[in-house]
Amino acid sequence: MDKLTDLNYTLSVITLMNSTLHAILEDPGMAYFPYIASVLTVLFTLHKASIPTMKIALKTSRCSYKVIKYCIVTIFNTLLKLAGYKEQITTKDEIEKQMDRVIREMRRQLEMIDKLTTREIEQVELLRRIYDRLTVRKTDEIDMSKEINQKNIRTLDEWENGKNPYEPSEVTASL
């Protein structure tokens, strides 16, 4: 029944608009008829599209204020586009979403910088340790006797019988 009533209401509005337009057309001095007709068509379409949408949205949603605000912003943005403007109206919710996104990105970049600086500090510490191990330390006295095996060296006077056992002697071979 609601659909029939709505259809009857729509037909009566169209009939009213037609009779109004015919009354305007009878005046020969009316030069702005196409503009007025297009504006009336847009207004009628917005009226017919927005009222049922708003009723459904208000019945189904719990947060009616946000729905109404969103619908109104959408209608104004549509009108601005029809008028030729490139700017759009934004709500505080959209601005807050963008700000939250920017803040999340900044936090992510700060965490990345913190990780990178921590790694760089660790690398510098590692390089310092490697450098400390590679540097030559000056020592005053080094006991090289172990290296060249000179602790058990005897002089010629210390050999038994005064003879050097490593000195070659004459060898005779039988033929």
Curated annotation (Swiss-Prot):
Pfam families: Rota_NSP4 (PF01452)
PTM comment, free text: The N-glycosyl content is primarily Man(9)GlcNAc, with a small amount of Man(8)GlcNAc.
InterPro entries named in the record: Rotavirus_NSP4
GO BP term, example: symbiont-mediated activation of host autophagy
Residue spans, topological domain Cytoplasmic: 52-175
GO cellular component, one term: membrane
Protein family according to the UniProt entry: Belongs to the rotavirus NSP4 family.
Subunit structure: Homotetramer. Interacts with the immature particle in the viroplasm. Interacts with host CAV1, early and late in infection. Interacts with host integrin ITGA1/ITGB1 heterodimer. Interacts with host integrin ITGA2/ITGB1 heterodimer. Interaction with microtubules blocks trafficking to the Golgi apparatus.
Domain notes: Binds 1 calcium ion per tetramer.
Function: Plays an essential role in the virus replication cycle by acting as a viroporin. Creates a pore in the host endoplasmic reticulum and as a consequence releases Ca(2+) in the cytoplasm of infected cell. In turn, high levels of cytoplasmic calcium trigger membrane trafficking and transport of viral ER-associated proteins to viroplasms, sites of viral genome replication and immature particle assembly.
Protein name per UniProt: Non-structural glycoprotein 4
Naturally occurring in which organism (per UniProt): Rotavirus A (strain RVA/Rabbit/United States/ALA/XXXX/G3P11[14])
Classification of source organism: Viruses, Riboviria, Orthornavirae, Duplornaviricota, Resentoviricetes
